[in-house]
Amino acid sequence: MTYFDPKIQESDFALSSYDYTLPFSAIAQNPANPRERAKLLIYQRDSGRIIHSDFYHFCDFVPKDTLLVFNDTRVIKARIYAHKLDCNTQKLSDKTFEIFYHKPLQSTSSAIPLFLVQIKGRVKCGDKLLINTDSTNPFLIAQVQECLDNGLRVVSFMQNEHALEYIQVLDMLEKYGHTPLPPYIKREDSCQDAHFYQSVFSKQLGSIAAPTASLHFSKESIESIKAQFETCFLTLHIGAGTFMNVESADIRHHLIHKEFFSLSPQSAAAIQNAHKVLCIGTTSARCVEYYARYKILQGECDIFLYPSKSFKRVDYLLTNFHLPKSTLMMLVSAMVGREKCLELYKLALEKGYRFYSYGDGMLIL
């Protein structure tokens, strides 16, 4: 069952058609604890039936002979804080600069590893930002190599005048970084976020946001799923593009972000041979659909799914409730139709469901 609403209208391509009003009180600021306490809205497309439940009963609704596909990416502690170092006086500024790590850059012209970051605060090329100001360890410095638009900067990370390699940068972020909570969570990160803003099966470090549909499962519930259904894992590293606004009034003109993905030959075979495929989250769905079209096991996924773009391999989807006018909401609309998506979101609000990353989920069958 890979169909979408066949009654495509011109309004389905209008960005404004994906807007809805969401009160701040409906945006989850903290995770459900235990994870399975999160609510679950089940929408059965064949019958039009809607059921309200929770993740304790998730397996009860998944059809037999279904393959469940999970994204095992792991979230980097991508947010770090630093102080500008005056090169003449060697004094530190009082102002704190936020550095938000994005990804490593491939460069043939640079002799040192370079990284893309976003810096809050005015900096220029050559500026040095000291990260571990209260440490007796050798100083860790981010040096600005190039200034790009939208606060983006190309930097190198240095320790004792030696440039850090990618693995060393990940180690540094793990030690000094903070959990990169999305901007709509209006609080500082805490110790609980290091645990709850990470799926229990995450392995491959590389995302700067969590695949949020995966956050609803404890180790016990994953074991229960594996005992009842076939499962497989893939990796798609979620980048900063997931938070980018769609600027085109006609969504067909939007250029979606690229994200690194990888799946094993075993997972690819399982997906290809499965009777039915249930993707846990939109990232898994995008990866599966990319593979279904191009049969590539590793690369950069830039598939954009919206009404009129049919699913070729994904039959069912588990997903959270997404931001208005977001590409994720458009992906859901590709599966159920835009008007039905808005109708389900309206119902979820009326029933007290929590939205966004730490919010509740919807199972589309």
From Swiss-Prot:
Function description: Transfers and isomerizes the ribose moiety from AdoMet to the 7-aminomethyl group of 7-deazaguanine (preQ1-tRNA) to give epoxyqueuosine (oQ-tRNA).
Q: Which InterPro entries match?
A: QueA, QueA_dom1, QueA_dom2, QueA_sf
A single MF term (Gene Ontology)? S-adenosylmethionine:tRNA ribosyltransferase-isomerase activity
GO BP, sorted A to Z: queuosine biosynthetic process; tRNA wobble guanine modification
What Gene3D superfamilies does the record tag this protein with? Answer: QueA-like
- Pfam families per the record? Queuosine_synth
**In which broad location class does this protein mainly occur, judging by the first location in its UniProt entry?**
cytoplasm
Q: Does the keyword Transferase apply?
A: yes
Q: What class does this enzyme belong to in the EC scheme?
A: transferase
Q: Which GO terms describe its cellular component?
A: cytoplasm
Q: Tell me the pathway.
A: tRNA modification; tRNA-queuosine biosynthesis
Q: Which family does it belong to?
A: Belongs to the QueA family.
The subunit field of the Swiss-Prot or TrEMBL record says: Monomer.
Answer yes or no on keyword Disulfide bond. no
Provide the protein's localization.
Cytoplasm
UniProt keywords (A-Z) are: Cytoplasm, Queuosine biosynthesis, S-adenosyl-L-methionine, Transferase
EC number from the UniProt entry: 2.4.99.17
Q: What is this protein called?
A: S-adenosylmethionine:tRNA ribosyltransferase-isomerase
Source organism per UniProt? Helicobacter hepaticus (strain ATCC 51449 / 3B1)
Q: Which reaction does it catalyse?
A: 7-aminomethyl-7-carbaguanosine(34) in tRNA + S-adenosyl-L-methionine = epoxyqueuosine(34) in tRNA + adenine + L-methionine + 2 H(+)
